Amino acid sequence: MVIAIVIVAALAGVVLYYHYSYGTVEVYVQGDPSFAVYITVSSVMLHSESGGWITLSNSSTTVQLTNSPQLLTSSTIPAGNYTELRMVVSSAEVTIGPVNVTASVPSGILKIPIIKGGLHVTGGSTAKLEVLMGPHLVSTGNGQYMLSPVVTAEQIS
């Protein structure tokens, strides 16, 4: 009986520790709806204020940039403060008139500062991060296009 109580108490302690040491982060993307832009993101990472990168996702997800936020990924991470988001963009497609064209993204990596003091993740709660992309499309000649968006991120809850 005493052993059972000790085991239950230990398990409760582990659950409480995990609950208050980790929080959930949801990353949303939003863009300029003046033309259709689809990006495929193969990796999403957050940089911790205390140093080091936390991987949120390594699976490919395609989202359309619209004026309403689209969920890109959700993950459980250690509570703390985060200052930068990094997204690996494996492909981008833009609709220009009736034609879909592939656009390159310089370096394939978007390094996005988290403005207004960064992202604060508290144990046992959910923090939402919104990535705002102002797509800047440049014709590089011969039917080739480059997408070099102006991007920021901010905590919305």
Predicted segments, located by residue:
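N-terminal Sec-pathway targeting helices
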Residues: M1-I7
